[in-house]
Design a protein with these regions (language model features):
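Conserved beta-strand positions in repeat-built beta-propeller and related beta-rich domains
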Residues: 6-13, 51, 59-62, 112-115, ...
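Acidic, glycine-rich loop-and-beta core segments that form the ion-binding/anion-interacting portion
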Residues: 38-89
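Loop/turn-rich, solvent-exposed surfaces of beta-rich toroidal or solenoidal domains
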Residues: 96-160
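Short loop/turn segments immediately following beta-strands, especially the blade-tip
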Residues: 21-30, 70-79, 123-131, 169-178
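A short beta-strand motif characteristic of beta-propeller blades
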Residues: 32-38, 83-92, 133-139
Length: 178
């Protein structure tokens, strides 16, 4: 039974994006906020992905081009930001927007798509601590990757918005390579 929802708000009106933890009451169907993380001005939290162990949450920030790791306490409904990594190589000097974050089906990797640099960043999850280590940055073979998902066959499918393509990748869940 899932008890929490993580809601990201970009904060374009007031400039302060946030991620909120909301506890779901299965009897009443209502949500209650239990915690909130405020991003830096204009970093714009975009999406959050929860690890299968329900203790680790990964959030991407669209304008900040970052992935953040949070340790989550599912008893109290609180989280703590522990790590922040870039979603694009340090050599990128142009515009980029992080657009999607996902934990792969094996629970060993986090992937983030980056629009305008047309790439997918892959990070290995430390199985004990939840911390991330960059595996690499891979071209999405299209223009402006918006969303991606994993099929039951283990393949990764990337939807490229501006090239109107869906590209199928072999994903190695041992090395994290696309």
């Amino acid at each position: 039974k899932k008890n929490f929802l993580f809601a990201c708000a970009q904060g374009r009106v007031n400039g302060y994006g946030q991620m909120r933890a909301l506890r779901y009451d299965h009897e009443t169907g209502e949500f209650t906020q239990t915690d909130r993380f405020l991003s830096r001005t204009w970093d714009e939290p975009r999406h959050a992905a929860v690890h299968p162990n329900n203790r680790w949450v990964y959030m991407c920030e669209e304008k900040g081009n970052k992935v953040l790791y949070f340790r989550f306490d599912d008893e109290k409904g609180t989280f703590e930001a522990l790590q922040e990594l870039t979603t694009v190589p340090e050599t990128v000097t142009g515009y980029s927007d992080a657009s999607e974050v996902m934990v792969d089906p094996s629970g060993k990797f986090v992937l983030v798509s980056n629009r305008y640099t047309d790439s997918i960043a892959v990070y290995r999850i430390d199985p004990v601590t939840g911390y991330l280590r960059n595996v690499g940055f891979y071209p999405c073979l299209g223009k402006t990757p918006r969303f991606f998902c994993f099929g039951d066959n283990g393949k990764c499918y990337v939807a490229n918005e501006d090239s109107d393509t869906i590209v199928e990748f072999d994903f190695d869940n041992v090395t994290g390579t696309l």
